Amino acid sequence: MDVHDIAGTAVAGSPAPVPRARPPRPGKSMLQDVEQIRLAIEMIGLGARLQVLESEVSLPRVRLIRLYKELCGVSPPKGMLPFSTDWFVSWRPNAHASMLLGAYRFMTSRGSLDGIRAVLSSYRMYREQLCATGEASQLSFTRAWTLVRFYERGMLRLARCRDCRGEYVVQADDARHRYVCGLCLPPARAGKGRKPAPAALAG
C-alpha cells in the first residue's frame, strides 16, 4: 500500500464533519411570541377592541383577528374608539372612572406594575369592587384603557372633593379649587336613575 492509498483510507475512514448550528433569526423569540399571545387572549377575554390589541400586543393584525375569531366566534367589531374626554366627567360614568383611575394609581405606585399590566389589574379590581356593591358596570375594558391614556397624556386629572375628600376625574383645564363632586352635588336629573357607585370607592 503506497502513500496515496494510506491517505485515501484515512480520509474515507474519518468521521463526517458536524454541521454548524444556524444562528438564531433576529426578532422575537418563541417565548416572547407565546407571551404576546397570552396577553392578547387575556385582553380579548376582558372585551378589548381590535384597535386596543394592536396598540398593546406586538402580533400582526391578521393573527389578532384570527385569534379574536377563535375566542369569540365572531369578527372584531368595527368603528372608532372613544375619543372624547367629556364622557368620563359626566355624572354617572364619573364615579366609575374615578374608581378605576384610583385603582390604576394604586397598581402603578404600590403594585409595581406599569403599562397594560397595570390597566389589566386595575380593571379587575374595579370589577371586583362592583361585584361587592352590586353596582352595574359603566366602564368597558376599552373605556378603561382610553381613560388611562387620557390621564397619562394630561387630558384628564384627579381633583379632591372639598366635602367628601374623595378624588374624582376632571378635565385638565377645570379648576380644582373648592371642587365639589357629582355625588355630593348631583345634577337635578340625577334622582331619576339609579345611584352611582358609593363615594368611598371613588377615591
Curated annotation (Swiss-Prot):
GO cellular component labels: cytoplasm
Major localisation: cytoplasm
GO biological process, one term: positive regulation of DNA-templated transcription
Cofactor: binding comment: Binds 1 zinc ion per subunit.
Cofactor: Zn(2+)
Binding site for Zn(2+): C161, C164, C181, C184
Subcellular location: Cytoplasm
Record carries keyword RNA-binding: no
One of the Pfam families matching this protein, by short name: FlhC
GO MF annotations in UniProt: DNA binding; zinc ion binding
UniProt KW keywords: Activator, Bacterial flagellum biogenesis, Cytoplasm, DNA-binding, Metal-binding, Transcription, Transcription regulation, Zinc
Complex formation: Heterohexamer composed of two FlhC and four FlhD subunits. Each FlhC binds a FlhD dimer, forming a heterotrimer, and a hexamer assembles by dimerization of two heterotrimers.
Main function: Functions in complex with FlhD as a master transcriptional regulator that regulates transcription of several flagellar and non-flagellar operons by binding to their promoter region. Activates expression of class 2 flagellar genes, including fliA, which is a flagellum-specific sigma factor that turns on the class 3 genes. Also regulates genes whose products function in a variety of physiological pathways.
Family from the record: Belongs to the FlhC family.
NCBIfam families the UniProt entry points to: PRK12722.1
Protein name listed in UniProt: Flagellar transcriptional regulator FlhC
Lineage, opening ranks: Bacteria, Pseudomonadati, Pseudomonadota, Betaproteobacteria, Burkholderiales
